[in-house]
Curated annotation (Swiss-Prot):
This is Polyamine aminopropyltransferase 2. Catalyzes the irreversible transfer of a propylamine group from the amino donor S-adenosylmethioninamine (decarboxy-AdoMet) to putrescine (1,4-diaminobutane) to yield spermidine. Pathway: Amine and polyamine biosynthesis; spermidine biosynthesis; spermidine from putrescine: step 1/1. GO terms for biological process: spermidine biosynthetic process. It comes from Caldanaerobacter subterraneus subsp. tengcongensis (strain DSM 15242 / JCM 11007 / NBRC 100824 / MB4) (Thermoanaerobacter tengcongensis). S-methyl-5'-thioadenosine binds at residues 53, 128, 157-158, 184. Spermidine binds at residues 84, 108. It catalyses: S-adenosyl 3-(methylsulfanyl)propylamine + putrescine = S-methyl-5'-thioadenosine + spermidine + H(+). It is found in: Cytoplasm.
Length: 297
């Protein structure tokens, strides 16, 4: 159950600006339109303050086990596969032979799960600033193959990792950091980050970036901001979008290409996907008129 309430309505039991109320029956998430989205809580799994952010894992009546970071919903067990399949597979299929993959933002490890479905993959480096998020998600939200022999995890600020990286170039990079422009991932949403990322890619490479909400007024600034930055660095930047049920929003992504000139799929779709297929791949790149107008495409 999700309720949308104006600020100040029913807040007497809320201990802070967001999160669980004192009864532990509802979780309050600030809505960018000025109100709140309120979720009915079935059980509280863990509340934890890391060095970087507040981590809440709760079981919601509607969405099941869900991850909140600093009061913002990140993922639910009911539909995480929609988000992660949309994030990973368009970029992976475009590259002719993705062997080395960089994942910026490991989180629950679901992107690692999707990447390893491609037999060409030899190495995955996953970078996340918050080791505790990764550990708690593995414990409470289901194991993912982050301990596969092809996977190496680095717990560091993503921008610092990119800046200091001197290893073999990457074929695919997946940028899946939190969508606020002022939180732990603020160093990623910068022109210098993507310029340096471009330098550590191979001659032929694909990059996918989660582009935040398409229509919500505040986060839309991030959507346009990211697109403008990517256009300054990559010769081809293609936006796409789809509806994420638990977000109650149209969510955007960008594929950026280096040394590849089109989105022609070069790999078959992995067999065990739940959402993404050929029809979906065609549909998501057909943006609604308001989005095309905002991006000038």
């Amino acid at each position: 159950m999700i309720l949308k309430l104006e600020v100040g309505v029913g807040l007497k039991n809320l201990n802070g600006k967001w999160g669980l109320d004192s009864s532990k029956e509802f979780y309050w998430e600030p809505d960018v339109e000025g109100g709140y989205r309120v979720y009915k809580v079935k059980s509280v799994i863990i509340e934890h303050q890391s060095l970087y952010q507040k981590i809440d894992i709760v079981e919601l009546e509607t969405w099941g086990k869900s991850l909140f970071l600093d009061g913002s919903l990140q993922s639910t067990e009911s539909d995480e596969f929609i988000y992660h399949e949309l994030l990973v597979h368009p970029a992976m299929r475009v590259h002719p032979s993705p062997k080395r993959v960089l994942i910026c933002g490991v989180g629950e490890g679901k992107s690692v799960r999707e990447v390893l479905k491609y037999p060409t993959v030899k190495e995955v480096i996953g970078v996340d600033i918050d080791k505790e998020v990764v550990a708690l998600c593995q414990k409470h939200l289901g194991k993912t193959p982050i301990d596969d022999k092809r996977v190496r995890l680095v717990y560091q600020d993503v921008a610092e990792f990119i800046k200091n990286y001197r290893g073999e170039p990457f074929d695919v990079a997946i940028v899946d950091v939190t969508d606020d422009l002022d939180g732990p991932a603020r160093s990623v949403h910068q022109l210098d980050f993507y310029k340096r990322l471009y330098e550590i890619l191979g001659e032929k490479a694909t990059v996918v970036v989660q582009g935040t909400s398409a229509f919500s007024k505040v986060k839309n600034v991030g959507f346009c901001h990211i697109y403008e930055i990517l256009k300054e660095v990559f010769p081809f930047v293609i936006p796409y979008a789809d509806y994420i049920p638990s977000f109650s929003d149209l969510w955007t992504f960008f594929v950026a290409l280096k040394g590849i000139k089109d989105l022609t799929p070069r790999h078959e779709i992995p067999r065990d996907l739940k959402y993404y297929d050929e029809y979906t791949n065609e549909r998501i790149f057909t943006l609604a008129k308001p989005l095309r107008e905002k991006l000038g495409v």
